[in-house]
Amino acid sequence: MHPMLNIAIRAIRKGGNIIVQNYDTQKFIKEDLDKKKIFIKNIMYKTYRIISEVIYKSYPNHIILNKNTDLIKNEKNTLWIINELDGKNNFIKNFPHFCISIAVIMKNNTEISVIYDPIRNDLFTAVKGQGSQLNGYRIRCNNINSLNYSTIAINLPLKHYAKSLFYLKIYKKLILSGISLRCTGSTLLDLAYVASGRIDCLFDFNPQSINLIAGKLQAREAGCLTSKFTENSEKKSEKGNFCTSNLTSSSKFMRLITEKISQCYSFNN
């Protein structure tokens, strides 16, 4: 096992213990939502701190960043990117679907990824060039070339709904094609699920690169491709639309999806 992967696993499991302990505790909090958010913020801080302590103990000269930090190119230093809680709203609502992630970047390349679901005890790991694993077993994405009966996850922040009904038109096109849609509230877990074949595809309408670095390596090492699903870049809302799919032997799946969404753009214009 890669020595940095070993440290990342040790750190993320310790962080997961804090998340689980407080997940059970916060069920009994009766304060208003604002106070509960402060409680969650404190949990995230503790999680980030314990993960950082484990990493610094072995690699005191490395740089550790969290998901709110702007990622800059750094050829000299090794960077550790921590997302201490992806799926925060699920956690607040006691919906057990969230995760922690660590990504290790060396010479501007993501080399190691760990995603941990502390509730299910699912540990997704990936090392560049060595594939992806779930709980120590090699995983690969599904090999499909049809939209029928496929399951697609969607990441769309609520703020986009208020601006346009355009996304609802996309949903309609996809549903009529026989697709089952999911909006789970944790894009990182969605990427891990695409990598492991639990989900066939992810549409990300609001990608935040530093948040999803770990998930993208997981998907890529499992045989997935990530690409833009529209060529139109005139509107800001369209610039960040990406599709990660389990496209392993045929481009038919991507072509069909692109065709459906292109129809929506034409109709919208």
From Swiss-Prot:
Any single GO CC term annotated in Swiss-Prot or TrEMBL for this entry: cytoplasm
GO terms (BP aspect): inositol metabolic process; ribosome biogenesis; signal transduction; transcription antitermination
Catalytic EC class: hydrolase
GO MF entries: inositol monophosphate 1-phosphatase activity; RNA binding
Highest rank taxon of the organism: Bacteria
InterPro entries to which the protein is assigned, alphabetical: IMPase, Inositol_monophosphatase-like
Subcellular location(s) of the protein: Cytoplasm
Cofactor(s) demanded: Mg(2+)
Keyword list, A-Z: Chaperone, Cytoplasm, Hydrolase, Ribosome biogenesis, RNA-binding, Transcription, Transcription antitermination, Transcription regulation
Xref: Pfam families: Inositol_P
Primary residence: cytoplasm
Annotated substrate binding sites: L85, D86, G87, K88
Annotated EC: 3.1.3.25
Record's catalysed reaction(s): a myo-inositol phosphate + H2O = myo-inositol + phosphate
Family under the similarity heading: Belongs to the inositol monophosphatase superfamily.
Subunit structure: Homodimer. The rRNA transcription and antitermination complex (rrnTAC) consists of RNA polymerase (RNAP), NusA, NusB, NusE (rpsJ), NusG, SubB, ribosomal protein S4, DNA and precursor rRNA; S4 is more flexible than other subunits.
Functional note: Part of the processive rRNA transcription and antitermination complex (rrnTAC). The complex forms an RNA-chaperone ring around the RNA exit tunnel of RNA polymerase (RNAP). It supports rapid transcription and antitermination of rRNA operons, cotranscriptional rRNA folding, and annealing of distal rRNA regions to allow correct ribosome biogenesis. This subunit may play a central role in organizing the structure.
Annotated protein name in UniProt: Nus factor SuhB
Native organism: Buchnera aphidicola subsp. Schizaphis graminum (strain Sg)
Species classification: Bacteria, Pseudomonadati, Pseudomonadota, Gammaproteobacteria, Enterobacterales
